[in-house]
Amino acid sequence: RVALLNTVRPLCPDVPPDLLQDFFVRLDQEYFQRFTPPTIAEHVRLTAKLTPEHLCEVAFADQPDHRCVITIVAYDYFSEFAMICGLLSAFGLNIEEGDIYTFAEKTAPLSSRTSRNEYGPRVRPKATPGLAQKKIVDVFRVQPVPGVELGRKQQHQLADTLSSVITLLDKGQFEEA
C-alpha cells in the first residue's frame, strides 16, 4: 500500500497527513484493489470534510446511460446501510450495484513518551476531529425508475435528507430516522 499511498498523496495535498494515513490503514485491501488512485483520492477528500458537526458527504457522478454513481462517505452508525438503501429507493432509484466499505476499528495510538524515565504530562499531537470514529465509504450505481428524474435539485434533496437521517442516527434516534 505504500506505493499506492505515495501515488494518492499528491492528488489530495490539502488533506491532513494523519487523515490520509488513517484512511489507508483502516480500509481493507479489497477497497484498494477495486478503485483507481484518482477515485481513492476523491474518497479521501470527501472523508476529510467529515467532522463531528458534519456527519456525511455525498457525491454524484452522472453516467452517460442515465445512470448515476452515488458515493456516500460518513461516520458509521447502527442500521445506517439499511437507511441509505431505503432512502435511495424512496427517491425512486434502483440500486444496480453497491461497493460497501467500513473502516476497521482504530488501534490505540502509541504513547508520546519515549522511555519510563520521562516524567511530566504527555504531549498529545493535535488530532483531526472525528479521526478515531469508524467511517463508511459506500459507492452505489443507481438508475432512476421510469418517470423519476435525478437532476441537480433531486441530488441536493437526497443529500440533505441523508444528512438529516444520519444526524438522527448520531443522536441515537433510530426510530425517528
Model regions and ranges:
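Non-catalytic interaction/regulatory segments
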Residues: 1-177
